[in-house]
């Protein structure tokens, strides 16, 4: 369960405080696929950073599986992210000098997990890249690079996957395929997926839409889509 309670995030602008998020609250049950939508500047990415423990709120709390992130040190939050959280970004963030399988394998090895190569190969096969294991990022299309990034994000079997505009650099067809892949992994792995997107068509493919405007939740609805 991911719970946000009265989240507020303020930044100092000269002599004034600028509130980017204002008293945001919701709960996301485990295994749900949720989209956070809203116009540019609505606070989507700021909210994602708070939910993931990458930033701390000015007021309010975030809980992951009953653990209040506010009660944790920075090192403890980093440890929790490594154990329970996966990330996918718009810019892929692959290491260009590593092959597809190495990009997935290296984080596993750094965590000391046995069978890292086998797990990496299995994940890449599941995202449809079993024949691209030894390709470098520059030899892959944008959609293929994002699939490598998704495989890497699921390598630690996360309880929650945060995806920040994962289709933003892709054409419509490829973006749809990426969301279909996230849906399949959400169902198969049981991970909660929190997707930030500006594309309402993409959002409608998830189970629930939380809409922000000017840092406030203005809509929270189920889409009728099942995982």
Regions found by a protein language model. Name each.
Residues 216-227:
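Conserved beta-strand-loop-alpha-helix hinge in the C-terminal portion
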């Amino acid at each position: 369960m991911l719970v946000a309670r009265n989240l507020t995030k303020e930044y100092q602008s000269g002599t004034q405080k600028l509130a980017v998020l204002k008293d945001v609250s919701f709960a996301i049950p485990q295994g749900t696929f949720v989209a956070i939508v809203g116009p540019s500047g609505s606070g989507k990415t700021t909210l994602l950073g708070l939910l993931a423990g990458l930033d701390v709120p000015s007021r309010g709390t975030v809980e992951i599986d009953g653990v209040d992130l506010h009660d944790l040190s920075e090192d403890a939050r980093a440890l929790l992210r490594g154990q329970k959280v996966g990330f996918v970004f718009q810019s892929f963030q692959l290491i260009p000098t590593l092959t597809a399988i190495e990009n997935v394998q290296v984080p596993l090895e750094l965590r000391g997990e046995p069978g890292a190569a086998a797990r990496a190969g299995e994940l890449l096969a599941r995202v449809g890249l079993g024949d691209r294991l030894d390709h470098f990022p520059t030899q892959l299309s944008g959609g293929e690079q994002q699939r490598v990034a998704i495989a890497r994000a699921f390598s630690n079997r996360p309880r929650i996957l945060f995806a920040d505009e994962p289709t933003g650099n892709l054409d419509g067809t490829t973006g749809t395929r990426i969301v279909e892949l996230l849906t399949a992994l959400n169902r198969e792995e049981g991970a909660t997926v929190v997707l930030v997107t500006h594309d309402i068509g993409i959002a409608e493919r998830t189970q629930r839409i939380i809409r922000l405007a000017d840092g406030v939740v203005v809509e929270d609805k189920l889409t009728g889509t099942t995982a």
